């Protein structure tokens, strides 16, 4: 029973996970750190990422803030150790496009991770390798040879574009992906991944030269 003038502080810790990662009921019992301990670990992790990723510019403070805001969005939107997903078109800030993945990741976002967090870049490319079977199936539906990566995909690699004409017309993604894979190899020299990616490159090459 609290006496007059006494204070009671309640500390509530939550954990966000999915059934793909761990049994939620088991995971909820693994939170043993206090808020201060979790905050200290998070601060160290973020300090390390900023040390690797920060970009300083000569310009107005608002411009510097904008650069860092975008870096923050890239880091938080990429699940660096989970190749079953990629980066949603609007990151974690918006529900537009239902969190689906586009070619923007392969051409525009990959470069950032190549030179700041190669492990994350590899994860993004492994997502494309993993979803090659769906790209082959998509090519069959379009009466094409080889593989044709869908315009708008979710975690299972299938076409999610609701507008048939856009999904059917946007062909360049099939060339964008092997280009991105080559960019990754050039930056890292990762021979093991290069061998994994060869099938994807070969099948998209068939589509390009049909």
Segments predicted by a language model, with ranges:
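Acidic/polar, glycine-enriched structural segments that form the non-catalytic walls/loops
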Residues: 1-96
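Residue-level preference for non-acidic, small/hydrophobic
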Residues: 5, 108, 202-204
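Short, charged/polar micro-motifs that form catalytic or ligand-binding hotspots
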Residues: 60, 98-99, 111-115, 164-168, ...
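Aromatic- and histidine-enriched alpha-helix N-cap/loop-to-helix transition segments
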Residues: 65, 99-106, 116, 169-176, ...
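Alpha-helical support elements that line or immediately flank enzyme active sites
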Residues: 69-74, 105-119, 131, 175, ...
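Helix-terminus loop motifs that line ligand-binding clefts
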Residues: 78-93, 119-179, 185, 192-195
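Aromatic/hydrophobic pocket-lining residues that form the small-molecule binding cavity
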Residues: 121, 201-202
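Conserved small/polar residues in nucleotide/adenosyl-binding loops
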Residues: 204-210
């Amino acid at each position: 029973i609290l006496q007059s003038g006494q204070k009671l502080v309640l500390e509530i810790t939550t954990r966000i996970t999915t059934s793909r990662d761990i049994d939620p009921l088991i995971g909820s019992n693994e939170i043993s750190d206090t808020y201060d301990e979790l905050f200290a670990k998070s601060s160290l992790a973020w300090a390390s990422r900023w040390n690797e990723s920060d970009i300083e510019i000569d310009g107005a403070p608002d411009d510097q803030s904008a650069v860092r805001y975008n870096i923050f969005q890239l880091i938080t939107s990429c699940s660096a150790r989970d190749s079953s997903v990629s980066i949603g078109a609007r990151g974690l800030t918006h529900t537009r496009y239902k969190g689906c993945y586009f070619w923007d990741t392969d051409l525009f976002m990959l470069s950032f991770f190549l030179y700041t967090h190669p492990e994350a870049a590899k994860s993004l490319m492994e997502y494309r390798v993993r979803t090659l079977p769906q790209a082959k199936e998509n090519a069959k539906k379009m009466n094409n040879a080889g593989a044709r990566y869908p315009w708008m995909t979710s975690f299972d690699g299938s076409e999610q574009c609701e507008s048939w004409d856009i999904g059917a017309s946007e062909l360049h993604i099939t060339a964008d992906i092997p280009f991105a894979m080559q960019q990754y190899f050039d930056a890292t020299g990762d021979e093991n991944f290069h061998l994994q990616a060869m099938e994807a490159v070969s099948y998209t090459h068939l589509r390009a030269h049909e």
